[in-house]
């Protein structure tokens, strides 16, 4: 089996209808699985930033980047190595919390620095923002209480330091 690597790509694209479809279609046609995808308008409304997380065979990383760069709507693509990127993700999670368990659930929520968003009769909903690894650990802990449902935003990332995507060659 080939050496699979998780890659974090940041793409600056024109903010136009159909761009997301073209990027997703490229990944689907090539058989690349998208683990996480976030898209949002940038500081300039004419552009959007896509953060694409994918598990790719190591030798295909540059190929994926070249294929993305060839799309007309894509202005620039950079590979955000973990050490060179600021990453964050948001989790909303609803867990079972009967009266006898509420203190334990709240203690777990507080120990991770999460926020309580809602308390129902039998559930507690919390929000946690942080690295994907922190989100994963929190989910593991909350699983002991019984997860009703959860939603993850997907990873969003920027290059660390002073450079920005427009300056990267």
Locate the predicted segments by residue.
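Long, contiguous binding/interaction regions
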Residues: 1-49, 53-169
